[in-house]
């Protein structure tokens, strides 16, 4: 697939977990961007499940609900209106509510919480993570000399501790990596 696109089965539900990594050291993410809007549109058209997680020092669930596809007996225009309204509502919800409550960022715990929302779901499973990649708490705390650590050694250590998040069969979209404020 080309950059920014995913190949999702059109006849399968979409299960989307969004990790919002709003933090003091990163610019605010635009939840109306093309990739997330496309994923939300596909979810709202095909039905599935939406999970929203805030990645702060104690990651928490913002939202987790099933999303029904529009009634097929409606006109295509009406279905499009319903889908667009749902996409706009989801983006607005994230923009307004993705606010850290706890200092720091525990990326591993946030990804694990998001992965729980995808476990056991049949169909397309997608994790969309909007964060700068700097975890400052939990098992992958970059303030503890991890910036220069060998990535394979970090992954091995996370696995040995039982902290390697299982994303088998999940499409992963990362946005905002390396974006830091100031």
Regions found by a protein language model. Give the residues of each.
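C-terminal region of N-terminal signal peptides and the immediate post-cleavage residues
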Residues: 1-9
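Von Willebrand factor
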Residues: 8-123, 125-128
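Second-shell loop/turn segments in exported
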Residues: 19-28, 93-104, 179-182
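Well-ordered, non-membrane alpha-helical segments in soluble/globular domains
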Residues: 29-39, 107-112, 145-159, 182
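VWA/integrin I-like adhesion module and closely mimicked acidic/polar interface patches used
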Residues: 134-182
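Sec-exported extracytoplasmic/periplasmic mature domains
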Residues: 40-45, 112-123, 135, 139
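Short acidic, S/G/P-rich loop/turn micro-motifs used as interaction or catalytic elements
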Residues: 22-27, 58-60, 119, 134-141, ...
């Amino acid at each position: 697939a080309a950059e920014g696109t995913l190949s999702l089965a059109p006849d399968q539900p979409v299960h989307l977990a969004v990790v919002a990594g709003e933090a003091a050291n990163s610019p605010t993410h635009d939840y109306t961007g093309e990739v997330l809007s496309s994923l939300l549109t596909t979810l709202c058209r095909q039905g599935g499940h939406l999970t929203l997680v805030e990645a702060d020092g104690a990651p928490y669930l913002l939202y987790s609900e099933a999303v029904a596809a529009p009634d097929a007996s409606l006109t295509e225009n009406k279905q499009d209106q319903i889908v667009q309204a749902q996409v706009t509502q989801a983006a607005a919800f994230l923009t307004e509510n993705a606010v850290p409550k706890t200092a720091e960022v525990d990326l591993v715990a946030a990804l694990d919480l998001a992965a729980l929302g995808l476990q056991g779901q049949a169909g397309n499973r997608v994790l969309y993570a909007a964060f700068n990649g700097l975890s400052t708490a939990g098992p992958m705390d970059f303030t503890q000399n991890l910036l220069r650590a060998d990535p394979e050694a970090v992954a091995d250590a996370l696995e040995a501790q039982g902290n390697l998040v299982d994303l088998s069969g999940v499409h992963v979209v990362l946005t905002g990596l390396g974006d830091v404020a100031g």
